[in-house]
Design a protein with these regions (language model features):
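Interhelical loop/hinge segments that connect adjacent transmembrane helices in multipass membrane
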Residues: 1-11, 183, 202-247, 287, ...
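N-terminal membrane topogenesis motif
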Residues: 1-29, 83-92, 217-239, 345, ...
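Signature of the first transmembrane helix
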Residues: 10-72, 96, 101-109, 135-136, ...
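Transmembrane helical elements of multi-pass membrane transporters/channels
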Residues: 13-30, 165, 189-197, 201, ...
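Helix-loop junctions and terminal segments of transmembrane helices
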Residues: 64-80, 150-151, 210-214, 270-319, ...
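Interfacial segments at transmembrane-helix termini and the short loops linking adjacent helices
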Residues: 112-132, 261, 326-358, 465
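Hydrophobic alpha-helical transmembrane segments
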Residues: 126, 130, 160-210, 271, ...
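Transmembrane alpha-helical segments of multi-pass transport proteins
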Residues: 386, 436-499, 506-507, 526-530
Length: 530
């Protein structure tokens, strides 16, 4: 097995563990959200969201890129077997996040009256904002633990923490609301759940920390480590803050120019359905960063090139077909849950999904490679470019085309930055994406999506049973079409199957199912003489 394949195996294993954690925690949280919406009035539910908004905004200034630096340096030092520096990274990272988190929580607590009265014009929510302010500190524990798990590629521990947070949040919020505490109980339950998850995360990180050797002659270099981490991570933190302001601007121009609330409702529904794609995209993005951080281009240039091309091709083989499948099934999927209440939502979902097709040209890999190799200042420049394009583009597009204009703007605003990133990677690392593979993946997935869509259009869809039938047949038609087209067009070849077999070994019991699938593809290849 090549080192690139071995790294892909480790990353795939981590991604799989993150996937089941994301799915389970999202399902639990969704159930809780639905129940909470039934227990609280629409007004109280709105106050719950408003009270959490201000601390969430202030929390953006807590990180300073430290968590990203924890991932980067723990992965790098782990590959170098430099345990002493990993210890310093963990201790320095937690110390910084806790101190700054506490300071910002106190600041939010102090400003709660001003925020409630002047900013939100709702003096009655002062107490809610005061309690919600502690999310800045408790959230610091969770996010720092997540960074430590990611850098050490222990994503099963992260999934345990996520599920505990979702379960406690759902149970505590519902329980306290049922006790008659209303919005106050919902806020209390949320904070207690995040605190519980944070404590669990810290304890799990401590178990990893205790396993490290502890030579008595080596001291923790906390101040030097913090300086190094801030120097690396601060540009990324600035970029995150700028991107956050851009997201707020999107919401502002939508509310300002789109006067039809039903269109905004349909947009909200379609946004929730995009989560189906992010279930697959997020684990890929998360695990690529530590993978690139472990490589030194000066010493392992050829390996880095292979890993980059691997990452683009195999992330595209996962995300792009899922994206086209979601597009093809947008109508039955949304109408099963909501009927005809949100008629524009399927179209909005199709348009929002387009952004994930850029996975085929490296949208999930390029930034991770640049950050993993330490070029965070350049990544900040890319973010500034995106923001500079995003403000005027979204304003013009929403003014002219409403929600559709917003979706087009948000889906394409990152393209210039992506092209510059690919140019930077080509110039500095001498590697480009495999354009032939990317085009084949897009073609095979797109054609499968079209076949699925037109096949379903021939079926009746007037009843709930018929919609379920469409959904089931749609998945079957897409899966068969994609496999056959991929074989005929050589989108997947025998080398890919060998690599997939090796990577699948990281999936434990599921590897047997994947091997059965790979064996089936091999049989079909022989039939088609590919």
């Amino acid at each position: 097995m090549s080192k690139a394949t071995e790294m892909a195996k480790v990353s795939a294993k981590g991604g799989f563990h993150l996937l089941w954690g994301l799915v389970a925690s999202t399902v639990i949280s969704s159930v809780g959200t639905i129940i909470l919406a039934g227990l609280l009035s629409s007004g109280d539910l709105g106050l719950y969201a408003i009270a959490l908004a201000a601390p969430n905004l202030i929390a953006n200034f807590r990180d300073w890129g430290i968590n990203t630096a924890i991932v980067k340096y723990s992965a790098q030092y782990r590959s170098e077997n430099n345990i002493a520096k990993i210890r310093s990274v963990f201790v320095a990272g937690f110390a910084f996040e806790i101190i700054l988190g506490l300071a910002l929580s106190l600041l939010s607590l102090f400003l709660s009256g001003f925020l409630a009265t002047t900013f939100y014009n709702r003096p009655a929510i002062t107490q809610l904002i005061q309690i919600a302010s502690f999310f800045i500190l408790t959230g610091a524990l969770v996010s720092t633990a997540t960074a430590a798990f990611t850098g050490m590629e222990k994503m099963h521990l992260n999934s345990i923490m996520l599920i505990i947070q979702s379960a406690f949040k759902t149970g505590l919020i519902i329980g306290l609301v049922l006790l008659g505490l209303g919005t106050l109980g919902a806020i209390d339950g949320f904070i207690l759940a995040v605190l519980t998850a944070g404590i669990v995360g810290v304890l799990l990180v401590f178990t990893m920390y205790r396993e490290f050797p502890n030579p008595s002659h080596i001291k923790l270099e906390l101040m030097q480590t913090i300086k190094t981490m801030i120097k690396y991570g601060l540009p990324l933190s600035i970029g995150t803050i700028l991107a956050g302001f851009l997201a707020y601007f999107y919401s502002f121009v939508m509310a300002f120019f789109v006067t039809d609330n039903s269109l905004i409702g349909s947009y909200s529904v379609s946004t929730n359905f995009v989560v189906l794609i992010t279930f697959f995209a997020t684990p890929v993005t998360t695990m690529l960063f530590p993978a690139f951080s472990k490589l030194d281009f000066a010493k392992e240039g050829e390996l880095l090139k292979n890993v980059f091309q691997f990452s683009v091709k195999y992330s595209a083989l996962i995300v792009v077909p899922v994206t086209f499948l979601v597009m093809a099934l947008a109508h039955p999927g949304i109408f099963i849950l909501f009927g005809s209440k949100y008629p524009e939502a399927p179209l909005f979902l199709v348009l929002q999904s387009v952004a994930y097709l850029f996975t085929a040209i490296g949208s999930l890999s390029a930034g991770n490679l640049i950050n993993g190799q330490g070029f965070t200042k350049y990544n900040l420049m890319l973010t500034i470019l995106t923001v500079a394009v995003g403000f005027p583009l979204s304003f013009v597009m929403v003014f002219q085309f409403g929600i559709i204009g917003l979706i087009v703007a948000t889906s394409t605003v990152g393209v210039p930055s992506l092209l510059f990133a690919l140019r930077f990677i080509k110039k500095n690392f001498g590697v480009s994406i495999d354009w032939h593979s990317s085009i084949k993946i897009l073609f095979s997935s797109g054609l499968s999506g079209l076949l699925t869509y037109f096949s379903l259009s021939l079926l009746p869809s007037s009843s709930l049973l018929q919609l379920f039938t469409q959904l089931i047949f749609g998945v079957i038609i897409f899966a068969i079409s994609f496999v056959l087209i991929s074989i005929i067009t050589r989108t997947i070849n025998k080398t890919d199957l060998t690599n997939i077999r090796q990577i699948a070994k990281g999936f434990g019991p599921l590897s047997k199912l994947l091997n059965i699938f790979v064996n089936l593809i091999e049989i079909l290849m022989k039939i088609f003489r590919v």
